[in-house]
């Protein structure tokens, strides 16, 4: 069993509609906060999506990943997670 297969099994991950795999580990009773594990494998992409709440990303393992952020659907910035001790990102 590969590390990826092990993580998918142990964390009970399922395919995410925007790409990759995920499992929810917490959701508060008011649906204001949720925590998920999210994993992209090599050559997988996460599709652009609009946020309705702040999103906090944590990087645990693997190759660095570039996160693209656009507040106006025209210009964007990018942040590389997992590089130069950059292991979390808050997107508002």
Predicted features and spans:
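Non-catalytic, conserved peripheral segments adjacent to functional cores
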Residues: 1-89
